[in-house]
Design a protein with these regions (language model features):
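Acidic/polar loop patches that form or flank catalytic/metal-binding clefts of enzymes
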Residues: 51-56, 144-145, 158-160, 187-198
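Extended redox/cofactor-interaction regions of prokaryotic respiratory oxidoreductases
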Residues: 1-11, 37-38, 100, 104, ...
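Short, glycine-/Ser/Thr-/acidic-enriched flexible segments
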Residues: 17-18, 33-35, 44, 71, ...
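Short secondary-structure boundary/capping segments
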Residues: 26-30, 43-46, 173-179, 211-214
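Conserved acidic residues
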Residues: 25, 157, 243
């Protein structure tokens, strides 16, 4: 609420009229599980009304990367995973994304054997007119437009989704993905006051000690286990055989 005192507009999108919603500038009630539709509808309006941050998309995102008909990212060298290809507006040729003095296209001509990542995102958003969003989410079409306009024009803008929120529900990953696309498409990321914040606003917290007492013969140094290699380490008993696993306050 300190941000509100400094002039920020706070909008809460929540089926419930929570404590935060009561204090916000606007509360938008939404049908549970329909957040992805709202995000895609906002993306559609932003693109259709010239609110894309094109310089940001070209310089700082993979929106310009080319995708072939099989849905695979195109690369100059199959052995180099970072050699993504883009279509250069200046030379009218396919070049590496990190080549100098190029102007990568955000979209290419219809009928081309490839398309950009941005085109694929906008294709997903195309069916979601304000009216279609309203039918699915229960959010009035005028409110959908208002949200998209405010988010894309009143910069900096930030999305706070409170520790994953609907990410723990069915198709929640798509909802979070739509939020990140909103931030990237409008340049609302990587700058002060922007981004996607997954921190919570919890104030009622109880303090507990360790769930288990420390082992009496705990070694001084225990090698960490890389999250990405967790399965491999467990199956191989590496660095030690694992008979019991306890996870607290995080996912695996």
């Amino acid at each position: 609420l300190k941000a509100k005192e400094r002039g920020a507009k706070i909008v809460v999108i929540d089926p419930r009229k929570s404590e935060t919603a009561v204090r916000a500038d606007k509360w938008v009630s939404i049908i549970p599980g329909t957040d992805t539709a709202l995000g895609l509808g906002m993306i559609r309006w932003i693109a259709a009304n010239g609110k894309l941050d094109k310089p940001f998309l070209k310089q700082h995102t993979g929106a310009v990367y080319l995708v072939d008909k099989d849905g695979k990212l195109m690369r100059e060298d199959a052995k180099d995973p970072n050699s993504y290809l883009v279509f250069d507006e200046k030379s009218q040729k396919l070049v590496r994304h990190d080549a100098k003095n190029i102007d990568p296209a955000l979209e290419v001509k219809a009928g081309s054997p490839y398309r950009t990542v941005l085109s694929m995102v906008l294709e997903q958003a195309e069916p979601w007119t304000p009216e279609a969003v309203a039918d699915t989410t229960g959010v009035p079409a005028a409110t959908v437009v208002e949200l998209a306009k405010d988010y894309s024009t009143n910069k900096p803008s930030m999305i706070v989704n409170n520790m994953g929120s609907f990410q723990r529900t069915q198709y929640g990953t798509q909802a979070v993905g739509a939020q990140y696309y909103l931030a990237l498409l409008t340049g609302n990321i990587g700058k002060a006051g922007t981004g996607i914040c997954d921190a919570g606003g919890v104030t009622q917290m109880a303090k507990f000690g360790s769930a288990f007492p420390p082992p009496p013969n705990k070694p001084k140094k225990v090698a960490p286990i890389p999250t990405a290699k967790l399965g491999e380490y467990v199956l191989a008993g590496k660095p030690n055989k694992i008979n019991f696993w306890y996870t607290q306050t995080c996912g695996i």
